[in-house]
């Protein structure tokens, strides 16, 4: 059997972190060798529940749906696993959520296996099962209900996909972490007792109490369903123990049965119980809702008391703890989600964005690194998987030894860990109204986004895409989208008729403010539909203070509720504005008419190519610490930041602190998808090609090394981009081969975070040659993992366009 290191083909010595145990290595191989199939079981059970309970309030209908699924779905315990719990009928299969939509599923039944990337397999039996339930869901789904709420004024944006809202209309809870600490300390019994007391105190003459009454009943149903799910594993593990091939396996299965009889209903007392409790909840949340970015929160903080107690009592060793952690991470990769073909352009690699956060500071502002922080690093290094998404919270006092260990993991070349910076995130949260003690307890929840675990509402990011380069083209074209020919904004003048750069700036501001308002209208309509149609009970029950308020998350039950969209093409906007200002209006080397013609024709012909070369070679570029380009994009971005802050979300004034919007640059792989529909841009980019991702520079436009990139990024209004400022960098593995090189990188990171107040950074440590070879010989690189955006994915499951985008990124040296 090959080891992870041998399959990955990396030159880095993973002996530094040791290897998986034989059984976990086999488990990992079995999971990765398994083809992902479409699974209709959940959809069939959900249909049955919706039909039987169609007259009930939606909160009860949703509760009975989850009960039906958990009590009847297929269960299994893998022969190598120490943990029980599965999302679908088989590992890595993708369940279907018809209450959100069946439309794309039915349209693509015969296409899933033919995709360029994100391939899924499907049997004829599954196709028939899905077709058989389709009539019930035809108009009875979230997508349909959201569609009828959308005002006529925004239909053009939905028809053209301008705001990229498909994922929001097809998806459930996202970008949050429930209160795992409370789950472990109190068990679901503690939540149940609180609900019982809250229901007993209701004044049913108060009209608001009626919805609360049904919400509380739905929580009782859900908790009973979770208990039934766990007890089914008690029976299964006991049955398997009777047929176990060895005495050791028999004892392990009996221990699984004992633990499942206890958690998550009762508090956890050991590390094994804590892991099982967390996994049950993590798994069931992704059975309840078609979401993503459901994250583990500050794992090393709430788990450490159990680790410490077990080590002191001799119940566990460091090796046994690491093995159980690797088991949990392999379990995490079994969770899967199918998206429509068009949606995969923005979420390439079937990512679930399940984040684990370690490090950072305690609530009393001390370094939070503990022995478990190191064991998480070690276990993630051993499993070498794209999930979970590992984030380290950096702060000025971060333990130096721990920082060294983080770089050693990074050298393994699978894009982890990413770093978020306490020095900018905590003050930004406090400025937005988050209590200081909660701000110090934040975690990553998805890619680069952050929130307070167990207290933050639904979807703190991931709302509208705002394609800045396309907005610029619409501005230049007098409010008309050049790609579709449809009017997207009022007419503020055509670029060909402009006499100064100031005219363009004025038109940009008016157009961007208009489109921002339109995005808010779309978001609000979809959020209203989500609130009405698909309340998620377990997720709400485990988030403070939904029980206290008697409201689910989408009604405003969380303590905090902030949301942001995703702004795409930051660098393209910067470079385009710099080229227009310098080459057209300052130097006069191009007329507005010439530039516009070149854009319309995608730089065709000899003159077009010459103009393209001029734009690329002779204009200032973002990413080089050049104030000319950097300040232009900051000023242009500030307009969006100012406008989006004017509009509260649908939970504003209904309980949560916040209820407002802010900006964010976590564009995932939308730079590829959004680029497909964007014509040529004034930075020299060709039509249909990827945009720049996150806040990273355009490919190979950053000529002055990594330090200059960091300085350019730091000029963005980071303290206002609270939804995340995502920076990807790529370095050759040989760059980190020596100890002195590693220390150079650490010094660079500390400078970026301490002095420049950077928000986030992550690295692809892989050579261009390896990536090209993986395209040509995918069978030799099954385990090659790359950082796509704020998440990692297996290179071979990505579409060719996304692979090319990653290959094209600038490769830095230190």
What residue ranges belong to the model's regions?
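Conserved catalytic cores of very large enzyme subunits
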Residues: 2-216, 252-255, 259, 263-814
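Extended non-globular scaffold/tether segments
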Residues: 217-231
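Secondary-structure-rich domain cores
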Residues: 230-238
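Extended, structured, electrostatic nucleic-acid-contact surfaces
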Residues: 238-239, 307
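A conserved hydrophobic secondary-structure block that centers on an alpha-helix together
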Residues: 240-248
